[in-house]
């Protein structure tokens, strides 16, 4: 939230009641809204469906395989009693992270936090996740056909490294080589040549080690526009287009596994990374949100060390990360 400095105490009063004394009167109304939004985002949308299937296929044991809000059957079953019990277990001051950025002092912030948060039971800290994901033993594939969807979607995930480890920063740099900036490899070698509508790579922040993801959308296949095709033939045409894009994406990974990134390319992505991070932190709200998220994941000091850790990444680190993590037996394709 963004509030005037002289309204800080009122904000503490309101937010503490919202967090720890919520009203449940509109639970079932809001539940229906959430169900509709979930269906729109994950059931009827190729992009959302691809993300859902990617994580459900890549993970067999770790909770990362489940959507944050649960599956359709979970939402249908949720009751007010379930929500109240979940809130009682997890929404307490011990689990809360409060970050304030702006015209205030530490003493003022501490006094207000103690006044408005300590009036509630401290509660217990959420337990750590103890279920580890077994090592993937071979490639996995999931295919979904959405009726009426015109733009096919490709997602390729590889089990990666946890945040704040040397390999995580190497994979971050690798993703930037592939897709950060207009001269990135996937843009230059695939999109600009008209071989696909989009192509990108990402290394999402994950406390327990997430997925390094390649993604994109192929061009609409010429075969799908031929008159008289039945549904099965159209599906075959779209699937072949997706498989063609998958081959192009994996070919770029192969290059990174055999060739070192040039000094010029490495300098370019580090410069872009520094600029993008500074741009993301221009507002007080962005700084607060970033620090709060990082504190929950690995600790807020990660932000103060990030650029230094990224600047230390070498071309050899990038190639080693590609060889270690982006292997066929760790690949999941959707």
Regions found by a protein language model. Give the residues of each.
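Active-site-adjacent, His/Asp/Glu-enriched structural segments that form or flank metal-binding
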Residues: 1-48, 77-80, 84-95, 115, ...
């Amino acid at each position: 939230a963004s509030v005037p400095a002289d309204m800080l105490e009122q904000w503490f009063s309101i937010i503490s009641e919202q967090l720890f004394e919520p009203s449940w009167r509109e639970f079932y109304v809001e539940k229906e809204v959430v169900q509709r939004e979930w269906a729109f985002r994950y059931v009827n949308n190729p992009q959302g469906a691809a993300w859902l299937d990617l994580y459900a296929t890549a993970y067999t044991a770790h909770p990362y395989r489940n959507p944050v809000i649960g599956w359709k059957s979970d939402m249908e079953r949720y009751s007010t009693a379930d929500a109240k019990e979940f809130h009682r277990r997890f929404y307490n001051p011990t689990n809360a992270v409060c970050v304030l950025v702006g015209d205030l002092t530490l003493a003022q912030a501490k006094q207000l936090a103690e006044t408005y948060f300590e009036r509630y039971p401290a509660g217990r800290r959420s337990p750590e996740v103890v279920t580890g994901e077994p090592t993937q033993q071979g490639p996995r594939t999931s295919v979904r056909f959405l009726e009426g969807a015109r733009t096919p979607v490709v997602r390729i995930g590889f089990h990666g490294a946890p945040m704040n480890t040397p390999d995580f920063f190497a994979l971050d740099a690798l993703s930037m080589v592939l897709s950060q900036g207009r001269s990135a490899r996937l843009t230059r070698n695939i999109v600009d040549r008209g071989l696909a509508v989009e192509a990108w790579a990402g290394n999402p922040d994950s406390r327990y080690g997430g997925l390094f993801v390649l993604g994109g959308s192929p061009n609409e296949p010429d075969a799908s526009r031929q008159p008289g095709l039945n549904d099965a033939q159209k599906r075959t045409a779209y699937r072949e287009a997706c498989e063609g894009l998958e081959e192009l994406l994996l070919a770029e990974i192969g290059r990174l596994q055999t060739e070192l990134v040039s000094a010029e390319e490495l300098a370019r992505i580090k410069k872009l990374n520094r600029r993008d991070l500074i741009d993301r932190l221009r507002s007080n709200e962005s700084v607060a949100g970033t620090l709060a998220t990082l504190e929950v994941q690995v600790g807020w000091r990660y932000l103060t060390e990030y650029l230094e850790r990224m600047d230390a990444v070498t071309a050899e680190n990038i190639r080693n990360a590609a060889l270690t993590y982006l292997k066929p037996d760790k690949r999941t394709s959707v």
